[in-house]
Structure formats: C-alpha cells, structure tokens
C-alpha cells in the first residue's frame, strides 16, 4: 500500500493537521502557490516530496511548472493549472495535455475537486492554508491499495488555526 498526500495553494501557511497527515504519507505532492519556500520544510514524507511552481511562485527558481510521479498502476501528472483557464482550469484541456496519466493534479482555484467521470481523473486538493480556503483548509489523500485500486479521500480541517 502506498499513501500520497496532496495539497496546494498554501501561500506560506499550512494547516498543522494537514502537516501531520502529509508527514504520515509515503509521498507528498504540492500543486503550487507555495509563496514561501520555507513552509515546505515542515513537510517530511517517508519517501519523497514533489512540488510545482504556481502563478504566485515566480520567485522560486528551484521548482518546475510540471512534474510527474510513476507509481504502481499509473502515472500522476502535476501542474498548477492556471495555464488551462485562469478562473477555472479546463478539465478537457488538462486531459488533452496528459492523456496517458492515471491522475492529473492541479491547484489554483483553491476549491477541492475530484473528477473521476472520465479518464484520466482530474483532482484539485483545495487550499491547505488560510488564503481563500472557503471556510476550511483542505487536502486529498490518495491510497494505492493495488495497481487496480486507487482511492482518493477528501480531507477537510477546521479553519481556525494559528501559525
């Protein structure tokens, strides 16, 4: 079994319960708008962290715009999503760009989305911080039970937290 924590749009602040959840996972994926690179130091997954540059991360030169992760049963494509529609990234455009992925992860909207209507799946963890989190910090957890069984769970945490 492999566990992947997925977050985005932290803007320098990550909810403490999300940090705990991420650090219990094998992999962590951050879909951009990190803003303060130092905030990533709190994320210590068991194996590896992957992060991409968001539209508010132009100053973070260590990150690329697109990443991918190969896991048993498929590939995960990761990008911030803002180049596929500024207000609401197009799932059709993302699927056309990454047709061979099993899952496409994007951020940008700060809204949690799990779109499994077509292949590849398109998911957005929502905002894991305080900025435009629509009432609560959010993230996703992907559990790979086997090559055929991938389970995505939405996670929602109380908005009241101090950093």
Annotate the PLM regions.
Residues 6-8, 28-33, 50-55, 78-80, ...:
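Active-site neighborhood of phospho(di)ester-bond hydrolases with catalytic His/Asp-centered motifs
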Residues 12, 36, 83, 111, ...:
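Short active-site segment of divalent metal-dependent hydrolases/proteases
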Residues 43-45, 71, 96-99, 117:
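Short, conserved loop/helix-junction motifs that constitute active-site signature segments
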Residues 1-47, 57-68, 73, 135-138, ...:
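N-terminal active-site segment of His-dependent metallophosphoesterases
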Residues 50-88, 100:
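Helix-adjacent hinge/juxtasegments
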Residues 71-72, 99, 123-163:
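Binuclear metal-dependent phosphoesterase catalytic core
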Residues 16, 88-93:
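An amphipathic, basic-hydrophobic alpha-helix
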Residues 91-98, 112:
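Non-DNA-binding regulatory cores of transcription-related proteins
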């Amino acid at each position: 079994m492999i566990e992947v924590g997925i977050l985005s749009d932290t803007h320098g602040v990550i909810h403490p319960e999300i940090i705990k959840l991420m650090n219990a996972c094998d992999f962590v994926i951050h879909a951009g708008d990190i803003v303060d690179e130092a905030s990533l130091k709190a994320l210590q997954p068991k194996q590896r962290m992957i992060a991409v540059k968001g539209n508010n991360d132009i100053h973070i030169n260590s990150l690329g715009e697109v990443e991918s992760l190969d896991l048993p049963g498929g590939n995960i494509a990761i990008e911030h999503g803002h180049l596929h529609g500024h207000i609401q990234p197009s799932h059709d455009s993302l699927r056309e760009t990454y047709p061979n992925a099993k899952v496409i992860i994007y951020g940008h909207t700060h809204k949690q989305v799990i779109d499994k209507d077509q292949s590849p799946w398109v998911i957005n963890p929502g905002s894991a911080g305080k900025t435009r989190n629509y009432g609560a910090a959010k993230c996703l957890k992907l559990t790979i039970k086997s090559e055929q069984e991938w389970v995505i769970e939405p996670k929602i945490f109380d908005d009241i937290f101090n950093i």
